Structures are given as structure tokens and as C-alpha cells.
Amino acid sequence: MSAPRCAVRWLVALLGGPALLLVAPAARACGVSASGVASCSLAEHAEEVRPHWATGVSALYTSTELRFDGSVDADQTRYAALAALAYLPTATLVLQAGVGVALGGSLTLPDGKHEFLPGPTGSLGVDWRAWDDGRFFLLLSAVLSASFARTQLPGAEAVGYQALDLRIGGQFGVDVADVLRPYAVARAFGGPIFWQYQGADVSGTDAHHYQLGAGLGVRLSRLLNAFVEGIPLGEQALSLGVGLAF
């Protein structure tokens, strides 16, 4: 995705994944939404006192395999820094927007390593706390992302790289002592990549259209939360961040 394909998801990535669900009627469920920011709910359930806004920052590393026209495969790694702002119209619904910068990474192909130059990403997403009994919780998310970057092979001119991504995910977790929230996460995603390889325009997509992993949310204070998440299966990723409700 996520600023190429991996970065598109970071805002999920983002938006395919990790969040800003800093509300809950009675419990304090926590996870990571598609935007990637810690999602811990609050004890305050009255409409007049619960937070209606949240913001977060996160960092993320991803590693995956891409497949382009002509059965050309590429190994991709990316690093990114992300920021997100969310509006919480109800105690279970979060509407969010994110922006970020992919700071580095590469595409490794038969002709060598194509380095990514910094580029922007953007995303729009929605999170829904579908179930929460005060101990266990289920969070669902959907995010649409776009990313723009350039790649450069040593000795050659830089070329454009654009990606679109739609990611749908779910997290199931448990509240431990009202402080720790371990969870399992599954996401499915897809979308096109537009690039130029060896002088020709090509399109591609991820060889893996899923993520399976786990994470941990930590309640640092009434309004401040942090998270770390690892994805070993599918599109591999490691992310961490903090979220603040207000």
C-alpha cells in the first residue's frame, strides 16, 4: 500500500489496516483501525461527555510481493510516517481521514533494485464497533486509499508509481485489567498499481490480498492510548503509534 502500494494500506494503511475508535458505551475495547492508530474506547458513555474527535500518529514498515504485467514479480519494502484525524458521530462509529509520507523502501526486480523516493498518501475510512460486551470486542473497518510516488533505478531517470487500494478488516480482542487489549486481526484488500518498467507502462497488484496477525493496545490514560501490531502472514507489516481523543 500505501507511497506506493504498501503505503496505501498503511493509512490504512492505513486506511488496510490500523485507530481512532476512542469511544464505547460501557466498556473500553481497544484495537487498531484501518488507519493504523490505537483504538481504545472510553468509560464515558453519556453523549455530552464522550469524545467526538480523535487524532493519532503512527509509523509502519511493510514487506510484500507484487505482480506486474508479463508475470514480472517484485519484492517490495516500505517505511512510512502517518497522521489521521477522526470524527466520532456516535459511540460506535468513526469517520476518518489520513495523510502520510512514505520515507523509503525499494522494489527488487530482475534488473535490479528500484529505490522509492518520498511521496504522499491519502485515505478515507470508516470504523464500526460491531460488538462489545465489556470484555470481548469486535471492530470492523473499511478504507479507500491513494498513493503517489516515484521510483529510481541507479543510473536511470525516476518514473511515476501510483496505487489505489480498498481494504476491509476485522479485529477480535479482549480487555485485560482495563489496560491491555490484545487482539487478532484479519484484513482483505485489493487495487491496481500503475508503474513504468523498462520503458513500458505496466499495471500490477499485490500477490497477497490478505493480512493475518495480532496486536496489542495499551491504555496510557483516560484519553491517550498506544498500540503495536505485527502481521506475519500475507502482506507482512509492523506498526506502532499513539492516539488521543478530545
Regions found by a protein language model. Name each.
Residues 79, 83-107:
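Long, hydrophobic/aromatic-enriched structural stretches that serve as scaffold segments
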Residues 85-88, 113-120, 127-135:
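Short, charge-rich binding segments
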Residues 2-18:
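Bacterial N-terminal signal peptides that target proteins for export
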Residues 80-82, 121-125, 167-169, 213-215, ...:
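Membrane-embedded beta-strand positions in outer-membrane beta-barrel channels/transporters
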Residues 34-41, 46-48, 52-77, 88, ...:
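Outer-membrane beta-barrel transmembrane domain signature
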Residues 30-31:
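Boundary of Sec targeting at the N-terminus
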Residues 97-125:
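Surface-exposed loop and membrane-interface regions of Gram-negative outer-membrane beta-barrel proteins
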